[in-house]
């Protein structure tokens, strides 16, 4: 049985070509391994940088930030995924990827972080990248780390 998902999607960006709520829901659900209550918020650079500075003590604009709340109820994972629209747009352009593919990747990447995946060392990065690629393949999206 698929994990239960309670999802809120917030658009706080002036970008034109944002994914739909339905697309975001599909990407989140595909990456989910546990019942969860998640907010995905798409923001502009100022908000992403302010959050990165306030919560990670890093003064740059990230592509995605994840705020894990752990179990907010028995067996219910909680957290926020914040995606910076201008950075995702720039990276997609620089990498020659369709914008929707890169939004899917950043969404999946953030949801995996909520579930404990990371890329601190090579073994963890390989595990996370393999999982990302398998999820994205379901949407006919090529491996995000291979050209």
From Swiss-Prot:
InterPro entries referenced in this protein's UniProt entry, alphabetically: MetalPrtase_cat_dom_sf_prd, YbeY, YbeY_CS
Membrane-traversing stretches: none
Cofactor descriptive note: Binds 1 zinc ion.
GO molecular function, one term: zinc ion binding
Hydrolase recorded as keyword: yes
Gene3D superfamilies: Metalloproteases ('zincins'), catalytic domain
Cofactor(s) it depends on: Zn(2+)
Protein name listed in UniProt: Endoribonuclease YbeY
Organism this protein belongs to: Thiobacillus denitrificans (strain ATCC 25259 / T1)
């Amino acid at each position: 049985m698929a994990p239960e998902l309670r999802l809120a999607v917030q658009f706080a960006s002036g970008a034109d070509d944002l994914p739909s709520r339905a697309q975001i829901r599909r990407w989140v659900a595909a990456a989910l391994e546990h019942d969860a209550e998640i907010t995905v918020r798409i923001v502009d650079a100022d908000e992403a940088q302010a959050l990165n500075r306030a919560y990670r003590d890093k003064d740059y604009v990230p592509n995605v930030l994840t705020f894990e709340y752990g179990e907010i109820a028995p067996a219910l994972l909680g957290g926020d995924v914040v995606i910076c629209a201008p950075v995702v747009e720039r990276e997609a352009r620089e990498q020659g990827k369709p914008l929707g593919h890169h939004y899917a990747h950043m969404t999946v990447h953030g949801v995996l972080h909520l579930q404990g995946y990371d890329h601190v060392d090579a073994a963890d990065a390989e595990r996370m990248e393999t999982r990302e690629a398998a999820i994205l393949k379901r949407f006919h999206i090529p491996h995000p780390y291979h050209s």
